[in-house]
């Protein structure tokens, strides 16, 4: 029976049969000196056999998730309308191509080995109402500004992945929200229902998936144009950074690094290295990602690659599973186990090393470098206690994992004036702990995952401009969780640059 259930059988055979047997044969094993070799070979063989059986028995299909326990899904009142929307999405062109997802996996493999750094960031949740070219451009600019600082400090490439062109659906802690004695379904993101607090807006509407698709396609078009149309020129990006540090609050802290970068670019120009003969100076790659939460949407955009026969979720280059939906036997993990995109999974303070190992065995059975990104989100007060053991035990298993830190979700608080916010110092503290713990454990601190915007919002307190709780009301624009504004995001990049120098 274990061969019929691919989510369980490989671990069952290894833990129940192989490992105890090898343990009992200690004397023979010691004489041959093959303890670790035998175990590692067996595990690799079992992983490969698992993939063969999984494909051979066709246990996965793009709609097989529907047979599994599923969380955080809306209840659509009109099933016929839902089916119509799904069928329409299945006929639409892919938003990304399989080859691009493979390129990202190769880039993330370098992150896994410590040869590159992952910068992943963007809106908590994209919205239909705030969609415009200026907002996308400003987000793109801040990502580039952060990346050039991190590249220069870390002396390694930065893999840029936006939470963009699909980051619409949001998990909620409660199915309902109450205001002034009125109880309505919770807002789950513009792809599902409306933000306005009225009964009509809060009804899940499957046609919103179609609108989300078109907005994502427009966003992808802009990102591709920005990446190759001159906006990514390193000299321009550096000029933006020089403008940033002209503010007196910042020059003393970060001016030296920015000026060193200017001198380096000037030296390269003097040597004849410029945008006209070196495209890398004026072009860049920005990949897209989002939480694969709304599975009807993800299924509809999952396509079989004509070159390899593998399945890819073509709604984004990279997908991740949230902390609330990462059950190893649940629908979200099952669905993403069958697509070949790079994957992420959020890991909170209550997770154990066995949780991470079990997820890796299901989501990355061939142990490919660059396939799996574990996104730590524990909070500044808990990461020091919880993360070291996970790193230690996962390292012992020999698993190829990209570790990144999400310092946002574990540090969310409610201000005295009722606004949900995050303190810059707490965000920085968790990032710093993440780097220090990895250095102590001999593992790679692979990247950061941030909720941020290119706009001058006032949603997170602190930073060099010392935003306080009274400032939150000035430009509190998020429809979900608080984001770092442009200045706070770039300041955080300069501070992370100091951590990278020590690696």
Predicted segments with their positions:
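N-terminal basic/disordered segments at the start of proteins
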Residues: 56, 60-115
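Cationic, amphipathic, low-complexity segments that mediate targeting or membrane/lipid association
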Residues: 2, 23-36, 40-43
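Short loop/turn segments at strand-loop or loop-helix junctions that form parts
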Residues: 119-124, 161-164, 405-408, 451-453
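Short hydrophobic targeting helices and cationic amphipathic motifs
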Residues: 5-15, 32, 39
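Non-transmembrane, aqueous-exposed alpha-helical and coiled segments at domain scale
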Residues: 356, 371-403, 409-457
């Amino acid at each position: 029976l274990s061969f019929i259930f691919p989510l369980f059988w490989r671990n069952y055979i290894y833990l129940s049969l192989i490992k105890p047997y090898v343990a009992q044969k200690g004397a023979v094993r010691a004489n041959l000196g093959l303890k670790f070799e035998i175990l590692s070979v067996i595990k690799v063989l079992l992983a490969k056999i698992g993939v063969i059986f999984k494909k051979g028995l066709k246990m996965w299909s793009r709609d097989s998730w529907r047979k599994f326990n599923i969380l955080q899904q809306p209840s659509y009142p009109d099933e016929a309308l839902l089916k119509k929307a799904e069928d329409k999405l299945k006929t639409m062109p892919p938003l990304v191509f399989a080859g691009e997802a493979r390129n990202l996996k190769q880039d993330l493999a370098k992150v896994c080995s410590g040869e590159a750094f992952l910068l992943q960031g963007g809106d908590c949740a994209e919205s239909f109402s705030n969609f415009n070219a200026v907002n996308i451009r400003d987000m793109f600019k801040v990502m580039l500004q952060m990346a050039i600082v991190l590249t220069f400090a870390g002396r390694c490439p930065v893999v840029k992945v936006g939470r963009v062109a699909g980051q619409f659906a949001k998990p909620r802690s409660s199915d309902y929200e109450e205001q002034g004695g009125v109880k309505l379904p919770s807002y789950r993101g513009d792809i599902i229902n409306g933000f306005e607090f009225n009964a009509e807006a809060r009804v899940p509407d499957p046609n919103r998936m179609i609108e989300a698709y078109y907005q994502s396609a427009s966003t992808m078009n802009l990102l591709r144009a920005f990446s190759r149309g001159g906006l990514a020129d390193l000299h321009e990006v550096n000029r933006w950074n020089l403008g940033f540090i002209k503010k007196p609050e910042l020059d003393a802290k970060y001016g030296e690094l920015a000026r060193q970068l200017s001198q380096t670019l000037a030296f390269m120009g003097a040597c004849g290295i410029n945008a006209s003969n070196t495209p890398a100076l004026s072009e860049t790659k920005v990949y897209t990602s989002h939480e694969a939460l709304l599975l009807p949407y993800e299924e509809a955009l999952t396509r079989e690659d004509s070159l390899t026969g593998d399945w890819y979720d073509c709604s984004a280059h990279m997908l991740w599973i949230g902390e609330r939906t990462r059950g190893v036997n649940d629908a979200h993990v099952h669905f993403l186990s069958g697509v070949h995109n790079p994957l992420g999974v959020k890991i909170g303070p209550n997770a154990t090393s066995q949780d991470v190992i079990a997820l890796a065995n299901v989501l990355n059975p061939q142990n490919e470098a660059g396939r799996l990104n574990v996104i730590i989100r524990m909070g500044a007060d808990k990461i020091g206690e919880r993360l070291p053991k996970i790193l230690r035990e996962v390292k012992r298993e020999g698993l190829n994992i990209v570790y990144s830190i999400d310092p946002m979700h574990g540090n969310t608080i409610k201000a005295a004036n009722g606004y949900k916010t995050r303190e810059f110092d707490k965000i920085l503290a968790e990032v710093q702990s993440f780097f220090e713990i990895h250095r102590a454990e001999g593992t790679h601190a692979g990247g950061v995952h941030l909720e941020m915007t290119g706009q001058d919002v006032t949603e997170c307190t602190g930073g060099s401009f010392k935003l306080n709780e009274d400032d939150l009301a000035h430009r509190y624009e998020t429809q979900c969780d608080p984001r770092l504004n442009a200045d706070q995001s770039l300041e955080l990049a300069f501070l992370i640059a100091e951590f990278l120098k020590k690696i």
